[in-house]
């Protein structure tokens, strides 16, 4: 299963991607092969780092979100996990998922006010 998560302002596919990762209230977890929502993780007081580690532990392939702070960026962008980060700000999760699968979203290469990585990105296209 190709796991793609979306950092959103609610639990439903129609809910918007949060403007900043730190503002998300939910992580929606999709099967990228079927585009079906398979799990919703509520923030419920979890820190950005805890959410990032949840994504790493589930071996997510991609995260659709807004800009990330350095601490969580370091987790999801680590060579060990190499979670591709797509900027889906301004879009509902379901639309952002389709756009990510069609390589129509920009990759987030750097954290907020920090130095990112060149990293490895899944099937990246420079269209």
PLM segments and residue spans:
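Active-site-adjacent beta-strand anchor residues
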Residues: 65-66, 86
